[in-house]
């Protein structure tokens, strides 16, 4: 075969290979879990107020849905002796939460779940903390009402749950602005 003919075979094969690699990369990206809510950590003053509002104690199991760096569950374990479950779809956030719990010496009191908070099992939670979005709170609401035991507390930073009236609200000053907290007690 002449050199010119080989060149005509190499170029289409190279293009095909590049196209196949691009399609594989796009397919991987499409399958990777991606958070529905942008990560923004709750300031320390808000974390403290959320746990106080929920009246967290040593018998509680605190679930933080969309846990980010794990600060709420870590503080519940450190300050109140509670157990906790950190749930986040983002593997980097779960790794960060696990590392922070290990640094605090609390990893044995906390379970870490890299999964979609819309499908995570909630039945063991006595307290659920949220800093999500109005839409995500509304999507979670039926599951919270169905799966949580009577007396369970739900505390949301910033967002309510539509026409489900909170049992209490609290404004917290974080040094820059006032932030609203909502508490519901499951009946």
Language model regions located:
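Bacterial N-terminal signal peptides
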Residues: 15-25
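S-adenosyl-L-methionine
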Residues: 26-60, 91-124
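Conserved class I S-adenosyl-L-methionine
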Residues: 59-68
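Glycine-rich SAM-binding Motif I of class I
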Residues: 70-74
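Conserved SAM-binding motif I beta-strand of class I
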Residues: 83-88
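A short SAM/SAH-binding and catalytic strip from SAM-dependent methyltransferases
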Residues: 123-139
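C-terminal substrate-binding/active-site "lid" region of AdoMet-derived donor-dependent transferases
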Residues: 135-187
């Amino acid at each position: 075969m002449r050199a010119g003919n080989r060149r005509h075979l190499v170029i289409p094969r190279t293009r095909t290979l590049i196209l196949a690699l691009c399609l594989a990369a796009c397919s991987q990206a499409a399958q990777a879990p991606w958070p529905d809510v942008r990560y923004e950590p709750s300031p320390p003053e808000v974390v403290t107020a959320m746990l106080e509002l929920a009246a967290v104690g040593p018998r509680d199991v605190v679930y933080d849905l969309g846990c980010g760096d794990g600060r709420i569950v870590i503080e519940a374990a450190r300050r109140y002796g509670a157990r906790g479950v950190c749930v986040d779809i983002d593997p980097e956030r779960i790794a960060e939460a696990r590392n922070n719990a290990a640094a605090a010496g609390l990893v044995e009191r906390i379970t870490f779940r890299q999964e979609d908070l819309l499908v995570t099992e909630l039945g063991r939670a006595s307290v659920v903390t949220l800093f999500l979005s109005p839409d995500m709170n509304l999507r979670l609401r039926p599951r919270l009402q169905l799966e949580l035991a009577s007396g369970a507390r739900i505390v949301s930073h910033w967002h309510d749950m539509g026409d489900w009236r909170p049992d209490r609200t609290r404004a917290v000053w974080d040094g820059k602005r006032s932030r609203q907290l909502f508490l519901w007690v499951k009946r």
